[in-house]
UniProtKB/Swiss-Prot annotation:
The protein, known as: Leucyl/phenylalanyl-tRNA--protein transferase
Keyword check for Transferase: yes
Major subcellular location class: cytoplasm
Cellular component terms (Gene Ontology): cytoplasm
Subcellular location: Cytoplasm
Molecular function, one GO term: leucyl-tRNA--protein transferase activity
Species of provenance: Synechococcus sp. (strain JA-2-3B'a(2-13)) (Cyanobacteria bacterium Yellowstone B-Prime)
Length: 192
């Protein structure tokens, strides 16, 4: 399959994201009136019950060591929007330095991870998964720390859910989101 990276990146730069229909697998661009945003400032909240685990060192963090495994982990659900075609797009974005996996490990076992796309100072979280309980939660906390350290200004989680709300995620109005996204595109940040 030939992937047109310029078109894919342009879509994300305009606030859209790709999803495959769970039944047919056909890809389409989606946009929401409001985006779920995970704050990278003092509004981010690490649940009190999770703090000892984050500090314990039980999970180690790695970047881009198991990208394909993270994509497969994110797709391994009874109903998934990550089709084989979308997996190929993520792989092409990864080879080009745009798509990344942020992973938690226990020894040599992949515990969980987050799949996302970095564009300037924006990180667009596509999906997350865990194999060991709390693996994805610790990954989320550590990813926020990582993004802060590297000067990222936006962590777009796309769609709100109760899990993200526990960490302080909030819905940002579409126009405000697009304004912030455009600012972020002009700020060079390195994910690695």
């Amino acid at each position: 399959m030939q992937v047109d990276l310029a078109t894919i990146l342009s879509g994300y730069a305009q606030g859209y994201f790709l999803m495959a229909d769970e039944e047919t697998g056909s890809l389409a661009w989606y946009g929401t009136g409001r985006h779920a945003v995970i704050p990278l400032d003092e509004r981010f909240h690490c649940p009190r019950s999770l703090r000892p685990l984050v500090r314990s060192g039980r999970f180690q963090v790695r970047l881009n060591c198991a990208f394909e495994q993270v994509v497969e982990g994110c797709a391994a659900r009874p109903q998934t929007w990550i089709s084989p075609e979308l997996k190929q797009i993520y792989a092409a974005l990864h080879r080009s330095g745009f798509a990344h996996s942020f992973e938690t490990w226990q020894g040599e076992t992949l515990a969980g991870g987050i799949l996302g796309i970095a564009l300037g100072a924006a990180f667009i979280g596509e999906s997350m998964f865990y194999r060991i309980p709390n693996g994805s939660k610790v990954a989320l906390v550590k990813l926020v720390e990582h993004l802060r350290e590297r000067g990222f200004r936006l962590f777009d989680a796309q769609l709100m859910n109760p899990h993200l709300a526990r960490f302080g995620a909030f819905l940002m109005d579409g126009q405000e989101y697009l304004k912030l996204l455009q600012q972020c595109l002009g700020i060079p940040c390195r994910f690695n």
